[in-house]
UniProtKB/Swiss-Prot annotation:
One of its GO terms (molecular function) is structural constituent of ribosome. The gene is rpsQ. One of the primary rRNA binding proteins, it binds specifically to the 5'-end of 16S ribosomal RNA. Part of the 30S ribosomal subunit. Keywords: Ribonucleoprotein, Ribosomal protein, RNA-binding, rRNA-binding. HAMAP family: Ribosomal_uS17_B. GO terms for cellular component: cytosolic small ribosomal subunit. This is Small ribosomal subunit protein uS17. Belongs to the universal ribosomal protein uS17 family.
Length: 98
């Protein structure tokens, strides 16, 4: 009897898009300390495949687990949930207009 695999899906923020067809996604999770019960914020980075180079730094994306695509890449970008604000874009417009 075959077991159906549950696909892992995570939501995170793109922290780097310097590589070709690859982005680094930081996924943040809240965990409770086992002894003190304080909620701790933990961040883990995943390298994800971005086929069309559509993601930019600051975007919030949904990634899904897939077969190994390279030495460290085991995730792929499913969708871009929200576009991140590009820093410095407004400043450039002001200097051109003014």
């Amino acid at each position: 009897m075959e077991k159906k695999k549950v696909q892992k899906i995570k939501i995170g923020r793109v922290v780097s898009d310097k590589m070709d067809k690859t982005v680094v996604v930081a996924v943040e999770e809240l965990v409770s300390h086992p002894l003190y019960k304080k909620t701790i914020r933990r961040t883990k980075k995943f390298k994800a495949h971005d086929e069309h180079n559509a993601c930019r730094t600051g975007d919030i994306v949904k990634i899904a687990e897939t077969r190994p695509l390279s030495k460290e890449k085991r995730w792929r970008v499913v969708e871009i949930i929200e576009r991140g604000k590009v820093l410095g874009e407004e400043e450039n417009l002001e200097t051109i207009e003014g």
